[in-house]
Amino acid sequence: MFDVTLLILLGLAALGFISHNTTVAVSILVLIIVRVTPLSTFFPWIEKQGLSIGIIILTIGVMAPIASGTLPPSTLIHSFLNWKSLVAIAVGVIVSWLGGRGVTLMGSQPQLVAGLLVGTVLGVALFRGVPVGPLIATGLVSLIVGKQ
């Protein structure tokens, strides 16, 4: 039996490799393995908890320099005294807000995920972009199409 979904996943994984977007390629390959093995019974759990677990892991990665001491408290304190750091803080707040909107929109309109994934891969492949922020991208989409 011909599995169109598997073919689409393989195509997206290939685009990930072609565009040097290892994160997307590996993620899709993991999902392919889950799909073609008995692990597929975990898809409901992955769909329900995957985004939250991913955000937790991402937050751990972002906070690690503070926890390890690589980013000393003095640097954090000085970030409130420099105008460039204040701009960075403001942008961080805006991006976090957009990411929150993105999570909401991805949950209510999951059909957007494929378009965002293709757009991310094309941006990396054609414009030497960096594959960051599908949640932020979805947040921007929510500003255009409305948060539903």
Curated annotation (Swiss-Prot):
It holds the Pfam family DUF441. Coiled coil: none annotated. It comes from the Bacteria. One of its GO terms (cellular component) is plasma membrane. It is found in: Cell membrane. It comes from Escherichia coli O157:H7. Keywords: Cell membrane, Membrane, Transmembrane, Transmembrane helix. Belongs to the UPF0756 family. Its main location: membrane. This is UPF0756 membrane protein YeaL. HAMAP family: UPF0756. It is a multi-pass membrane protein. The chain crosses the membrane at residues 14-34, 51-71, 86-106, 112-132.
